[in-house]
């Protein structure tokens, strides 16, 4: 299934909003994937990533 995850992460300039569509078996795995992607691409720790909404795409 595909999930659309919306949220924001903290940068030096402030909060940067994002929307990601990920392939996952359930909502929990979709969240883990987004935390992993944002963390690896932007070098942001999980406690600086705020998830606003997760919905099935």
Curated annotation (Swiss-Prot):
GO MF term set: large ribosomal subunit rRNA binding; structural constituent of ribosome
GO cellular component: ribonucleoprotein complex; ribosome
Record's signal peptide: none
Keyword annotations from UniProtKB, A to Z: Ribonucleoprotein, Ribosomal protein, RNA-binding, rRNA-binding
BP-aspect Gene Ontology terms: translation
Pfam families: Ribosomal_L18A
Similarity field: Belongs to the eukaryotic ribosomal protein eL20 family.
Assembly and interaction partners: Part of the 50S ribosomal subunit. Binds 23S rRNA.
Name the UniProt record assigns to this protein: Large ribosomal subunit protein eL20
Organism (species): Archaeoglobus fulgidus (strain ATCC 49558 / DSM 4304 / JCM 9628 / NBRC 100126 / VC-16)
Highest classification ranks of the organism: Archaea, Methanobacteriati, Methanobacteriota, Archaeoglobi, Archaeoglobales
Gene it is expressed from: rpl18a
């Amino acid at each position: 299934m595909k999930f659309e995850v919306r949220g924001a992460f903290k940068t030096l300039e402030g909060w940067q909003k994002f929307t990601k569509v990920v392939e996952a078996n359930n909502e929990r795995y979709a969240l883990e994937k987004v935390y992993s992607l944002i963390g690896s691409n932007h070098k942001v720790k999980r406690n600086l990533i705020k998830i606003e909404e997760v919905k099935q795409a």
